[in-house]
Amino acid sequence: MVKLSGILEYSMGGFLCLRGFADYKTLSRVSKENPDVQRSLIEEHKGEMAEFLNRGLYRFFPEVVLSVSLLSNNNYADVERFFETVRTFGSWKENLGNINISIFNHEAGDKNRVAHFAFDESIVQLNRVDGNHRLSAADEVTSSFKVPFCLVLCRNTDEESQYSRAIFHNINSKQIPLKLEENLKVILTSENAFSNEVLKTDPSFGWAYYLARVAAKNINFSEYPFINLLIQQEKYTFLKETFDSLLNSGYLPKADIAFDMFL
């Protein structure tokens, strides 16, 4: 039996969600890839994620988003009664289909509703809306830790299919992501925060980061007008991706001499 606990609330007045923390491997085990929205796994990225989660000093990621349909054996009336109970701040302590749900309303303080969801993972499997790559690396991760999760509760499978597509779309299209160049510049120009040794050894970064930093400091691109024209405002991206390619192909070693060989 698996138990997930957290705060039960309508997120931004829309989706009913259970938000909390749970064991990483447990979340991976009780959830599955959602073919409606998930991209195919890239094995190389899976390995990088596993290394990061096993050894990364800066190990962190946002909550994984999961979904579940509460409909089971045509229990439409019970599902509607549950949503009405939540909407009217009532208490609940009974099975809803294959899930045992308990809701406790606090009369004082911040008014948060604590809820516990218990279910048999051989019967109930959660769907992954966002975070599939992170959860799929669990079989290669040796350490144990908790991660934040958001479980979106749906009235039926049709609603779950609609909600998961909409949420996946909003997560991946509504935000304005930083360009890779801006991300790299933050790391490579912050030597006081991220030493050369950290760049070399921490799985969050790697030798390509270190060599890109060294190259950016020591190469005057104005002396190479054609290259300068090509990379324009993406110097750090160009250097990092170039060193990634050279290191992965074996043309350069993961050693300080690599920069001299590059020149």
Language-model segments: what does each one mean?
Residues 49-56, 138, 171, 215:
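Hydrophobic, Leu/Ile/Phe/Ala-enriched alpha-helical segments that form helix-helix packing faces
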Residues 72-75, 135-137, 157-160:
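Short catalytic/ligand-binding loop motif for oxyanion handling, primarily in non-cytosolic enzymes
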Residues 118-140:
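A sequence-level detector for short glycine-anchored, His/Arg-bearing signature motifs
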Residues 37, 41, 121-129, 159:
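Conserved aromatic-histidine-acidic binding/catalytic patches
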Residues 67, 128-131, 152:
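Short His-Asn-centered micro-motif
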Residues 43-47, 132-135, 165:
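A structural signal for well-ordered alpha-helical segments within the folded catalytic domains
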Residues 122-125, 140-263:
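Solvent-exposed functional surfaces
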Residues 1-118:
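N-terminal extension/subdomain marker
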